[in-house]
């Protein structure tokens, strides 16, 4: 309904697509081997889906309005909020006259469609190498508890976003004097954690059907998802406290 189409790209990338085309120098900490998974013989596993944005900018000329979902890879520990491989969705809008007002209105509409019309949205100044200005997007919403009562959540960060740096447009061959745009990125796993009250990201990877079956309906659980499925928690299992049989 918002006019986006899906775009995909390879999970293996060059340093240019993953970093340099996005105004991230190769001496940036994100490009270090401690954070990025490099391949023998050259190349790397993409650490975000932003290379899809660059490839899209190189091919069809604006207007562009895409969502780029896919797996990304980082040298992260496997814990309650991080995994070394995870899904990411990035969005890109580029056209003549795209402004910061368009940026805020689109992302606010996205949040309200996902969590309901009463969702509050705020934008906090931030920094990303490939957007300027940049912002973190937070939401606050009212949730229904198991006993039927309601309460307002704290502010929760859901994505990073910003206006596309003109240098990114120029690197891909797009006239930055004529076109402007914005980009945003989020992790569906963390979005699901916020939406359904899941506290441990690893639960989604444990293949416990008693947990996963809660999401088989058209819209998932009516209320917070239950992680109390009668099996040891992911934290306990990774401490050697039990295993699924």
Regions found by a protein language model. Name each.
Residues 1-227, 244-245:
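TRNA-recognition modules of translation machinery and tRNA-sensing kinases, especially anticodon-binding
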Residues 235-245:
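Long, low-complexity, intrinsically disordered segments
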Residues 225-227, 231, 235-236:
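Acidic, Ala/Val/Gly-enriched low-complexity intrinsically disordered segments
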């Amino acid at each position: 309904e918002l006019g986006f189409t899906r775009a995909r790209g390879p999970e293996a990338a060059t340093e240019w697509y993953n970093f340099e085309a996005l105004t991230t120098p190769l001496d940036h900490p994100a490009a270090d081997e401690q954070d990025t998974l490099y391949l023998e013989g050259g190349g790397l596993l993409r650490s975000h889906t932003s290379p899809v944005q660059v490839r899209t900018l190189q091919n069809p000329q604006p207007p562009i309005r895409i969502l780029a979902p896919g797996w990304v890879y980082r040298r992260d520990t496997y814990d309650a909020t991080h995994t070394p491989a995870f899904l990411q969705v990035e969005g890109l809008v580029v056209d003549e006259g795209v402004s910061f007002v368009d940026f805020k209105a689109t992302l606010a509409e996205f949040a309200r469609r996902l969590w309901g019309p009463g969702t509050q949205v705020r934008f906090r100044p931030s920094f990303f190498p490939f957007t300027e200005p940049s912002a973190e997007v937070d939401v606050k919403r009212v949730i229904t508890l198991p006993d039927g009562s309601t309460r307002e959540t704290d502010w929760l960060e859901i994505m990073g976003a910003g206006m596309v740096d003109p240098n990114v447009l120029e690197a891909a061959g797009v006239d930055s004097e004529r076109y402007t745009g914005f980009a945003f990125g989020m992790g569906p796993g963390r979005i699901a954690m916020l939406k359904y009250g899941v506290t441990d990201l690893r639960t989604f990877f444990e293949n416990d059907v008693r947990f996963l079956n809660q999401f088989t309906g058209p819209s998932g659980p009516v209320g917070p998802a239950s992680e109390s499925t009668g099996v040891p928690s992911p934290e306990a299992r990774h401490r050697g406290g039990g295993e699924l049989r």
